[in-house]
């Protein structure tokens, strides 16, 4: 039976794992790395590069190299955080027809789920290469604080990649699974502090033994889906730009190529300063003006970096305190603090965590791999391979509908364990009202306009009656993926309307199907391209081999034999230029057949030479080995014992 893989679809890096027996295993990609950069590049020849290969060419192709796309997934173009990103990304963020934030590359508008799907395809292929069988099912992780639109968009990305997403699981919960599965330390409450490339989550989780079952119950979760390592990088970039402007008067923000080089340098400097006190950013020929080329050389100390990002680190404290309060716990109730996400390697972040929770965070969890491992364990649970594990997750934000006066009436409170169902009866606001609009909202504000709109639908044909008389039952149903289904029913007529919430933004079914087909077509194109490369290589190797042999043994051939081989060589070289696989294969075969005579001559020559050498060798051996008469031959003997 095919396995369900676990994928950590990260902002900066992604990781894939699978259950092998009772143990989760992180799978290395084709480049031998355990994590893959979540970077997708669109090259000139329509080739799509993913991971390390995309990252390598980013400096020469900044406008078409897409990174940190997870920050845009499920977001509207007008959102403040999106507008902020537009000013710092070398690629173009554009408004889609449905007002979502999309990206433009090579003149084509691309939806974030379609870009993320390319990363998932790479993860899927990594798993297939390792397992030696097709993979069609996956558990994919998302930040705990992702709203409904973002979860739906992640699920869409999975479908575009050809994966059936069996479960969407929260990243801190996955990390808790990875941490707690083997621990036999009794009941304990843990805090998972997850500061990744683009998002921050804090989850308070209770791990308990309940009737022989390992139970992971999320008590509360909080976070910020636009706070992560990318923001730390941006602060360093801004500092470097300011320093260079002071020195040269040139603003590098207007130069996309320079901006991409700065991004790489800022990330490297940030990482270096986790283990050293000072580093220097050296970027020769960063730009040029009338006076000639300009070079950037800026020293950054760890103290300077910490002052640049201090406010970002401080922003993580609020959600931590809120999560503790929502869980009804104090700091002293927390047994362990787990760090997840690459940004938690920064010493200042670890200091902050210690300050918030009053204890040293644990260092025995790999912050880059724990989430994928947890997703693989959840895959094992769903498959039935992992027994006695129960995962109780929560919805991160309250859900409700807009009611009279523009107020949000909550049906499901935040931190409610999922799956869950809630229902409430509402009525009409006007006399003889025959239709109602159900406007679904997600958030914590009392005023409807202050919350995220997830979508709306109408319930029509309500019999005319005075206001307040009709009884309309609204049911909210959240599935195990944290995705909402809403229905409204007129209790008098039994008429019902229901929707799986797809935000007024989001991708339509037709768009998803088109993207699925595009991804499949691209996979077919890739296969054809690979087959063509293989045929070319084979033909090229054959041409090289025959030419070499012809130079050495051509004089042994009859005139017509030699000219036949030369003609076949010429045709094979012409075929190589054509780029047509069938032609190349046919001409390679023709060259192979034409060179048979040459191979025979080579073989005969080699045999003759070998015979002559053997004869000469025997004669000389006899003359050398025969002792002169009367001469004593001394010999040393060594006893060789048989190995027992």
Swiss-Prot record:
SUPFAM superfamilies in alphabetical order: Actin-like ATPase domain, Heat shock protein 70kD (HSP70), C-terminal subdomain, Heat shock protein 70kD (HSP70), peptide-binding domain
Residue ranges, annotated region (Disordered): 597-644
GO molecular function terms attached to this record: ATP binding; ATP-dependent protein folding chaperone; unfolded protein binding
PROSITE patterns: HSP70_1, HSP70_2, HSP70_3
Gene induction: By stress conditions e.g. heat shock.
Residues modified as Phosphothreonine: 199
Alphabetized Pfam families for the sequence: HSP70
Role description: Acts as a chaperone.
Name used for this protein in its record: Chaperone protein DnaK
Organism of provenance: Nitrosomonas europaea (strain ATCC 19718 / CIP 103999 / KCTC 2705 / NBRC 14298)
Gene: dnaK
């Amino acid at each position: 039976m095919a396995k369900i893989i676990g994928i950590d679809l990260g902002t900066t890096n992604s990781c894939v794992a699978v259950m092998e027996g009772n143990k989760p295993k992180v799978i290395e990609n084709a480049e031998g790395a355990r994590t893959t950069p979540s970077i997708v590049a669109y090259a000139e020849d329509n080739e799509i590069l993913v991971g390390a290969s995309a990252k390598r060419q980013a400096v020469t192709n900044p406008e078409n190299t897409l990174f940190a796309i997870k920050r845009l997934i499920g977001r509207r173009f007008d959102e403040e955080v999106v507008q902020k990103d537009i000013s710092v990304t070398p690629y173009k963020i554009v408004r889609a027809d449905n007002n979502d934030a999309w990206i433009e590359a090579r003149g084509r508008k691309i939806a974030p789920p379609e870009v993320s799907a390319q990363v998932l395809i790479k993860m899927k292929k990594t798993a297939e290469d390792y397992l030696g069988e097709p993979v069609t099912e996956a558990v994919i992780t998302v930040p705990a604080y992702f709203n409904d639109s973002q979860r739906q968009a992640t699920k869409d990305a999975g479908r575009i990649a050809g994966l059936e997403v069996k479960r969407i699981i929260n990243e801190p919960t996955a990390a808790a699974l990875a941490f707690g599965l083997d621990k036999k330390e009794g009941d304990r409450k843990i805090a998972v502090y997850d500061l990744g490339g683009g998002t921050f989550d804090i989850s308070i989780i209770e791990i308990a033994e309940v009737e022989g079952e390992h139970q992971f119950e999320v008590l509360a979760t909080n976070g910020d889906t636009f706070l992560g390592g990318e923001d730390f990088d941006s602060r360093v970039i801004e500092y470097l730009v300011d320093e260079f402007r002071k020195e040269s008067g040139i603003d590098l923000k207007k130069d996309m190529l320079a901006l991409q080089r700065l991004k790489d340098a800022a990330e490297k400097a940030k990482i270096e300063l986790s283990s050293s006190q000072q580093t220097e950013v050296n970027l020769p020929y960063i730009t040029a003006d009338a006076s000639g080329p300009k070079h950037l050389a800026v020293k950054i100390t760890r103290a300077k970096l910490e002052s640049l990002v201090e406010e970002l680190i401080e922003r993580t404290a609020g959600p931590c305190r809120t999560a503790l309060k929502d869980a009804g716990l104090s700091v002293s109730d927390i047994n362990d603090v787990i760090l997840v996400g690459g940004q938690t390697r920064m010493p200042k972040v670890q200091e902050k965590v210690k300050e918030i929770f009053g204890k040293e965070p644990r260092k025995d969890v790999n912050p880059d791999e724990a989430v994928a491992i947890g997703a693989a364990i959840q895959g094992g649970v769903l498959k039935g391979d992992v027994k006695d594990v129960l995962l109780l997750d929560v919805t991160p934000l309250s859900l409700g509908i807009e009611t009279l006066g523009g107020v949000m009436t909550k049906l499901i409170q935040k931190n409610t364990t999922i799956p869950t169902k809630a229902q409430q009866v509402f009525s009409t606001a006007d006399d003889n009202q025959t239709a109602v609009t159900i406007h679904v909202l997600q958030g914590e504000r009392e005023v409807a306009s202050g919350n995220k709109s997830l979508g709306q639908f109408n319930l029509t044909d309500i019999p005319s009656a005075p206001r307040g008389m009709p009884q309309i039952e609204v049911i909210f149903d959240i599935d195990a993926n944290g995705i909402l289904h809403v229905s409204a029913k007129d209790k008098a007529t039994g008429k019902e309307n229901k929707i799986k919430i797809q935000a007024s933004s989001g991708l339509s079914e037709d768009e998803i199907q088109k993207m699925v087909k595009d991804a499949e077509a691209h996979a077919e194109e890739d296969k054809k391209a690979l087959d063509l490369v293989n045929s070319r290589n084979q033909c090229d190797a054959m041409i090289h081999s025959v030419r070499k042999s012809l130079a050495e043994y051509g004089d042994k051939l009859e005139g017509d034999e030699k000219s036949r081989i030369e003609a076949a060589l010429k045709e094979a070289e012409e075929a190589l230029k054509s780029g047509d696989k069938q032609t190349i294969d046919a001409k390679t075969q023709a060259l192979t057949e034409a060179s048979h005579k040459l191979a025979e001559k080579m073989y005969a020559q080699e045999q003759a030479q070998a015979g002559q050498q053997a004869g000469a060798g025997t004669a000389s051996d006899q003359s050398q080995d025969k002792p002169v008469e009367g001469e004593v031959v001394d010999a040393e003997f060594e006893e060789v014992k048989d190995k027992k």
